[in-house]
Amino acid sequence: MKIERVNDNTVKFFITYTDIERRGFARDEIWYNRERGEQLFWQMMDEANEKESISFEGPLWIQVQAFEKGLEVTVTIAKTTIDGEQVDEDELDSLLRSAMSDAEEKETELSQDVLFETTDFEHIIALSQYAEAPIFEEVKTSLYQKDGLYLLHLHFKEETEVEEQENVMSLIAEYLNFSEQTIHPVAEYGKVIVPNDVFAFIRKHFPN
């Protein structure tokens, strides 16, 4: 799970479905079993408190966005409610169900082309040091720059198993954010930084 502290009051999480399952939660039960869904949510909060020393006390405003690979959860700690809205247990349950509906529509199959993004090149350098595992042999990589973002493009072989693809994306999601952009406009209007074998190139030119 990736934890990003946006400011003093806001924290953003990204957790892949693979990570959710590794934590002992079945993908379906977190949506349809209220108690299990809340257990996962507060487990994420506890991890943020442990790693970032964030105390989640007081009213919380929560936004859940579903992607085909996982969930992005934005939590804002407020002294007062935001836009008159405050999330209680029933609303948390409703948010999770809504996110699941969106995810089911997107999750028919994993795309062969996936984009990750970051504004900090150091994150790509750090990731590259851990991207020598055999699972990365199944993916082609290229790196672009566009609108102030570094965009890492992954292209998986057609025969790549879904579990292997999710394992790769789960590791990368610890360092970079999933991008909602698609490769075609990025390739057309962005600047190519590294055309292929991104991780090997970065390790060679930016040794740890």
UniProtKB/Swiss-Prot annotation:
Pfam families: MecA. One of its GO terms (molecular function) is protein-macromolecule adaptor activity. Enables the recognition and targeting of unfolded and aggregated proteins to the ClpC protease or to other proteins involved in proteolysis. The N-terminal domain probably binds unfolded/aggregated proteins; the C-terminal domain interacts with ClpC. Belongs to the MecA family. Homodimer. This is Adapter protein MecA. The lineage of its organism: Bacteria, Bacillati, Bacillota, Bacilli, Bacillales.
